[in-house]
Amino acid sequence: MGIPVGKSLLMLFTFLAFASCCIAAYRPSETLCGGELVDTLQFVCGDRGFYFSRPASRINRRSRGIVEECCFRSCDLALLETYCATPAKSERDVSTPPTVLPDDSPRYPVVKLFQYNAWKQSTQRLRRGLPALLRTRRGRMLVKELEAFREAQRHRPLIALPTEDPTPHGAAFVEVSSDLQ
């Protein structure tokens, strides 16, 4: 009788799937220019970074840059990968053995010792700037007394209160204002 409809549809869909895969494989790749090219390179290369031109090889002295290849011709993933930079070795890369220092290196800690003479010269230089009166013990005491006196002068009260009661024998003092008269 013939082929059932279900099987024929299944075969048709299978054929279309294979045909679309083959067409996609042989069709020319898309072109990338400008910002799209840079974004795609950043996505493909990631942390490695990328170059716009490959190092010149001996075989092909005139190598085209990625802009010339991807913008004017077709560009695919394999071509983009060739422009990715090689990753630099990280500090945690333990695949290579660390360099061994020679054993004859001195093991003494590097310490800058206190130099008394330099300290003494700097204090003498400071003392030369001070007046002779302030360098003596008596002079320093006079300066402290002078500072205490000035501090007391700065904090004196605004109103001097009398020590005695101004009213004689408890008599009340009545002030008459000039407005009432």
From Swiss-Prot:
Region annotation (A) ranges: 65-85
Entry annotated with the keyword Glycoprotein: yes
Keywords: Carbohydrate metabolism, Cleavage on pair of basic residues, Disulfide bond, Glucose metabolism, Glycoprotein, Growth factor, Hormone, Mitogen, Osteogenesis, Secreted, Signal
Compartments it resides in: Secreted
Source organism superkingdom: Eukaryota
A GO-annotated cellular component: extracellular space
Signal peptide: 1-24
Region (D): 86-91
Sites annotated Important for interaction with integrin: R48, R58, R61, R62
An example molecular function term from Gene Ontology annotations: insulin-like growth factor receptor binding
Chain intervals for the UniProt region annotation (B): 25-52
Disulfide-bond pairs as recorded: C33-C71, C45-C84, C70-C75
Gene3D superfamilies documented for this protein: Insulin-like
Glycosylation sites per record: T163
Post-translational modification summary for this protein: Proteolytically processed by PCSK4, proIGF2 is cleaved at Arg-128 and Arg-92 to generate big-IGF2 and mature IGF2.
InterPro entries membership: IGF2, IGF2_C, Insulin-like, Insulin-like_growth_factor, Insulin-like_sf, Insulin_CS, Insulin_family
Proregion positions: 92-181
Ranges for region C: 53-64
GO terms under biological process: embryonic placenta development; embryonic placenta morphogenesis; glucose metabolic process; in utero embryonic development; negative regulation of muscle cell differentiation; negative regulation of transcription by RNA polymerase II; ossification; positive regulation of activated T cell proliferation
Recorded family membership: Belongs to the insulin family.
Subunit and partners: Interacts with MYORG; this interaction is required for IGF2 secretion. Interacts with integrins ITGAV:ITGB3 and ITGA6:ITGB4; integrin-binding is required for IGF2 signaling. Interacts with IGFBP2.
Family matches, as PANTHER family: INSULIN-LIKE GROWTH FACTOR II
Note: The IGF2 locus is imprinted. Paternal inherited gene is expressed, while the maternal inherited gene is imprinted, hence silenced.
Function statement: The insulin-like growth factors possess growth-promoting activity. Major fetal growth hormone in mammals. Plays a key role in regulating fetoplacental development. IGF2 is influenced by placental lactogen. Also involved in tissue differentiation. In adults, involved in glucose metabolism in adipose tissue, skeletal muscle and liver. Acts as a ligand for integrin which is required for IGF2 signaling. Positively regulates myogenic transcription factor MYOD1 function by facilitating the recruitment of transcriptional coactivators, thereby controlling muscle terminal differentiation.
Official protein name in the record: Insulin-like growth factor 2
Organism expressing this protein natively: Equus caballus
